[in-house]
């Protein structure tokens, strides 16, 4: 059986787009632009003084802390302002000494009757620091 073309319809849609460009000519006004330039902040780096002790005669220098912590500040807050809150830690897992100003961590010394504790796996092994 052969089918016929009955019932088939075709629709053609035509769209016309008109663009109008308006150009306004105005006299340039006396406008000024003020730019304030700021000196770049120097990169932070560790510098050793002449009285810094050699780290285990290895030719390396040692600081009192393994990392430098910068407290987050709000935009526009001066970096020279200091608060009492600077005793917070940096929350780095590798930081053994913590960030307590003028305080040493107090750990009880093992007594002869107390068996030695296994090392904490979250702390680095004792020895020279490797970064």
UniProtKB/Swiss-Prot annotation:
Expressed in testis with high level during spermatogenesis. One of its GO terms (biological process) is ubiquitin-dependent protein catabolic process. It catalyses: S-ubiquitinyl-[E2 ubiquitin-conjugating enzyme]-L-cysteine + [acceptor protein]-L-lysine = [E2 ubiquitin-conjugating enzyme]-L-cysteine + N(6)-ubiquitinyl-[acceptor protein]-L-lysine. Residues 90-99 are annotated as: Atypical RING finger domain 2. GO terms for molecular function: protein phosphatase inhibitor activity; protein serine/threonine phosphatase inhibitor activity; transferase activity. Residues 92-104 have a biased composition (Basic residues). Residues 44-59 have a biased composition (Basic and acidic residues). Auto-ubiquitinated. Residues 57-67 are annotated as: Atypical RING finger domain 1. Residues 1-131 are annotated as: Disordered. The modification Phosphoserine is found at residues 78-79, 82. Its EC number is 2.3.2.27. The modification N-acetylalanine is found at residue 2. Residues 10-25 have a biased composition (Low complexity). The keyword Phosphoprotein applies. One of its GO terms (cellular component) is cytoplasm. It holds the Pfam family PPI_Ypi1. Atypical E3 ubiquitin-protein ligase which ubiquitinates TLR2 at 'Lys-754' leading to its degradation by the proteasome. Plays a role in regulating inflammatory cytokine release and gram-positive bacterial clearance by functioning, in part, through the ubiquitination and degradation of TLR2. Inhibitor of protein phosphatase 1. PANTHER family: E3 UBIQUITIN-PROTEIN LIGASE PPP1R11 (PTHR20835:SF0), E3 UBIQUITIN-PROTEIN LIGASE PPP1R11-RELATED (PTHR20835). Interacts with TLR2 and UBE2D2. This is E3 ubiquitin-protein ligase PPP1R11. The lineage of its organism: Eukaryota, Metazoa, Chordata, Craniata, Vertebrata.
